[in-house]
Design a protein with these regions (language model features):
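Alpha/beta-hydrolase active-site loop
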Residues: 41-62
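Single conserved hydrophobic/aromatic residue that forms the stacking wall/gate
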Residues: 1-6, 10
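Conserved alpha/beta-hydrolase
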Residues: 15, 19-35
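Alpha/beta-hydrolase fold nucleophile elbow
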Residues: 63-75
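Alpha-helical transmembrane segments of integral membrane proteins
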Residues: 311-564
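Short glycine-enriched nucleophile-adjacent loop
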Residues: 78-91, 99
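Short beta-strand/loop motif that positions the catalytic acidic residue
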Residues: 147-149
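Juxtamembrane interface at the cytosolic side of transmembrane helices
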Residues: 268-315
Length: 564
């Protein structure tokens, strides 16, 4: 199981490598996540959001050793482990023998179970935290337990200095009391307790069985632990040691990087296919009128104030986009779960671009009325005007292109098990129940991406931002992705320098990571829009195609509804 913004396939690096070493690997989407059903509020946490159901199912299979079952989860997937261990501890026969957390704290103190222990129909918060005194304890008994932690994890492995009240640096996690208690099976650390050592196995006999604890402190951040070869090697080493598996494969013997290269080529190829498919169809009689021939890059005329207006507008737009984006964060749009909008991250990604694009349109109109028009710019010469019938045919063409692209991708996935993904981003088949949620945010994505395409192509296909076509579009693509890149970069810079992720406030540690998630799509979509515009002089076609593809990619990778 994984965190709230991912499908199970993002963790396939671990899955593939474990399977190569002889493990039977079960991967699933948590309830309300990925392709799993949305449950009602009384069923959310039943059986660890699906993890304990999976464990019990695995124990019924003849090819699974019932005495060698382990669970592993990344980020919020670790929460499911917390809940599942709570249930397994209460079971007549415990099924789980080993636990590996990735980018998630273990349970250190007995009162921490209150935050996740409410399982409707099974336990109450009071029962879950019956030892509600905040003392360190051994939650895992004689199971083998490990943690893969990133030195710069944005969310986990945080501890407050009891003397100063300040956050302790994340890279010093092995010096924290939480880590020292965990490695020593729940003791209450004091000044004599040695700091932890990364990769060292701490052993102890518990209830007559020798168990171990281990923490792998890796370079990297919260989600990078899913892609780093060193973290994968640690995960292999843990499971092999936990169950004394005889394998000739070393922990560093991995093949996933080749799969990642192939899936990245496929993901980029999907956008390329959409561009060339659109260009080909635009020449067909059915869609005649959606293309007006090749666009010619205009030479920006030099008038007094030209550069000042151009760069001034750019700076104003960037500043507004930065402020409006942070405003959305501080008002919890990215975590919003309501009765109408049920995907906060999708709502945020669409709103962020739509709001800044509308503001850009207003600034551009002011620029046109106050400067460009007075200096001879003719609105009829920049491909902005169109007809209702042309818009209709453009919409039909965009739907045909995106529909064909998705069918091609899904067909390749179904017949050849091809993966179209790149790190965080990917596209895969989805359940029909997601279509309604997609349609809710589609208008927001359309506003953002269509206006962005108009700005990039109609207004700026000239030498103002670069003397040739390649430089021009690269500059504009970088500008489009600049706000999330700068905000994320500022947060990361503070984090890397101090070890504390608090630039935007202790309650908003997610900002550097979440902002980074939007950079790739905001950079690549101007390239696809320009590729289509340069051969059709139709700014709306690329904008609509980008909006639909970006919306699908965002929605299929986000939770629908999920508890805390």
């Amino acid at each position: 199981p994984l965190r709230r913004q991912r499908q199970m396939c993002i963790r396939d690096r671990y899955q593939i490598e474990w399977a190569r070493r002889g493990f039977v690997v079960f991967s699933f989407d948590l309830y309300g996540h990925g392709d799993s059903e949305i449950l009602n509020n009384t069923e959310w946490l039943v059986n660890g959001r699906g993890l304990y159901d999976t464990v019990k199912y695995a124990a019924t299979l003849p090819f699974v050793d019932k005495d060698q079952i382990a669970v592993s989860g990344q980020s919020r997937g670790g929460n499911t482990i917390h809940e599942t261990i709570l249930l397994d501890n209460k079971a007549k026969k415990q099924l789980i023998k080993a636990v590996l957390y990735v980018s998630r704290d273990a349970v250190y103190k007995d009162n921490e179970t209150q935050s996740f222990g409410y399982v409707p129909g099974k336990t109450t918060s009071a029962q879950a935290a019956s030892k509600n005194n905040g003392e360190y304890f051994n939650y895992y008994g004689n199971r083998n337990v490990g943690i893969i932690a990133g030195k710069f994890d944005q969310y986990s492995f945080k501890e407050t200095d009891k003397t100063t009240g300040k956050m302790l640096p994340n890279p010093d996690y092995l010096k924290h009391n939480n880590a020292k208690s965990f490695l020593n099976f729940g003791i209450t650390p004091d000044s004599s307790t040695a700091d932890g050592v990364s990769g060292k196995y701490y052993t102890k006999k518990v209830d007559g069985k020798e168990a171990f604890r281990v923490i792998y402190l890796e370079n990297g951040f919260h989600t990078s632990q899913l892609f780093q070869s060193s973290s994968t090697a640690a995960a292999m080493e843990f499971m092999v040691k936990a169950f004394n598996v005889n394998t000739s494969l070393q922990s560093g013997d991995q093949i996933y990087q080749w799969r990642m290269i192939g899936s990245t080529i496929g993901f980029i190829g999907m956008f390329m296919f959409a561009v060339f498919f659109a260009l080909w169809l635009s020449q067909m009689p059915l869609f005649r009128g959606t293309s007006r021939g090749n666009a010619i890059m205009r030479v920006a005329e030099s008038h007094p104030g030209t550069k000042a207006w151009a760069w001034g507008c750019l700076i104003v737009n960037t500043l507004f986009a930065t402020v409006s984006t942070l405003f959305l964060y501080y008002n919890g749009v990215d975590t919003h779960i309501g009765t109408f909008f049920r995907q906060g991250q999708a709502l945020f990604a669409g709103s962020m671009l739509a709001i800044s694009s509308v503001f850009t349109a207003i600034v551009t109109y002011i620029w046109y009325r106050c400067f460009a028009k007075k200096n001879g710019m003719n609105i009829d010469e920049i491909d902005l005007k169109t007809s209702a019938f042309s818009v209709f045919k453009t919409i039909m063409l965009a739907l045909t292109v995106t529909g064909g692209t998705l069918l091609l991708v899904w067909g390749a996935q179904y017949f050849f098990k091809t993966n179209f993904s790149f790190l965080y981003w990917g596209i895969m088949p989805f359940g029909s129940f997601k279509i309604v949620d997609m349609l809710k945010v589609l208008p927001i994505f359309l506003i953002g991406y269509v206006i962005s395409s108009i700005f990039i192509n109609c207004m700026n296909y000239n030498t103002s931002y670069g003397k040739n076509k390649i430089v021009n579009i690269l500059v504009l693509a970088l500008v489009t992705a600049a706000v999330p890149a700068l905000v994320s970069g500022a947060g990361w810079a503070k984090f890397m320098l101090t070890g504390v992720n608090d630039l935007f406030g202790a309650a908003y540690t997610r900002i550097p990571d979440s902002m980074f998630l939007t950079v790739f799509l905001l950079f690549i979509t101007p390239l696809t829009a320009r590729g289509i515009y340069s051969k059709t002089r139709n700014p709306y076609l690329g904008g609509i195609i980008n909006a639909i593809l970006a919306m699908v990619i965002t929605c299929v990778n986000c939770q629908v509804v999920f508890p805390a």
